[in-house]
């Protein structure tokens, strides 16, 4: 998507970019399940590097997956518009509208997944994906979004740097910007 966004190369978009993103969307759509709440849910996935990928790291609706699916839906629509196509845009808009909301704590912090707030220092802030790089929650989205952004960053920083790696600092610099 970034290659398309910055280069605006329609030939590359038609031959490579759009087919790749369309296939990713089809995969997501085929693997989502409708819950009793009427929302579409990720049945099972993990939050990267949390709990060394053991069974405690696996659950439904990881925030990172929800953010990536939302962004993929946006990319499908944007790319189809650029290519004057309308193959998947309606389906992408429907999936995005029905996708489960981001799980939040009572303090409005983004969770790793439903009922699992970040509970330890962690080098991979994947649960912050809706803020950056997905940019699905921005300070321009109103008071609720700003509250979630502020609370989530404060929580991440409060848990300390014990398990951070070099890339963690770069990610947090991008988040803070």
Residue ranges and their predicted role:
Residues 23-79:
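Acidic/histidine-rich catalytic neighborhood
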Residues 1-10, 15-18, 63-177:
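Active-site core of glycosidic bond-cleaving carbohydrate-active enzymes
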């Amino acid at each position: 998507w970034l290659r398309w966004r910055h280069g605006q190369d329609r030939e590359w978009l038609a031959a490579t970019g759009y087919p790749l993103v369309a296939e990713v969307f089809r995969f997501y759509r085929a693997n989502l399940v409708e819950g009793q709440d009427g929302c579409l849910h990720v049945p099972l996935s993990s939050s990267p590097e949390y709990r060394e990928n053991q069974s405690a790291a696996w659950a439904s609706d990881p925030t990172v997956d929800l953010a990536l699916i939302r962004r993929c839906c946006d990319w499908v629509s944007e790319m189809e518009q650029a290519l004057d196509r309308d193959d998947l845009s309606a389906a992408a808009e429907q999936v995005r509208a029905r996708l489960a909301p981001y799980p939040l704590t009572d303090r409005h912090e983004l969770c790793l997944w439903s009922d699992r707030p970040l509970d330890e220092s962690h080098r991979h802030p994947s649960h912050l994906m809706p803020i950056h790089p997905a940019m699905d929650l921005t300070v321009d989205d109103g008071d609720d979004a700003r509250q979630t952004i502020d609370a989530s960053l404060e929580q991440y920083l409060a848990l300390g740097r014990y398990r951070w790696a070099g890339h963690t600092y770069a990610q947090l610099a991008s988040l803070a910007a």
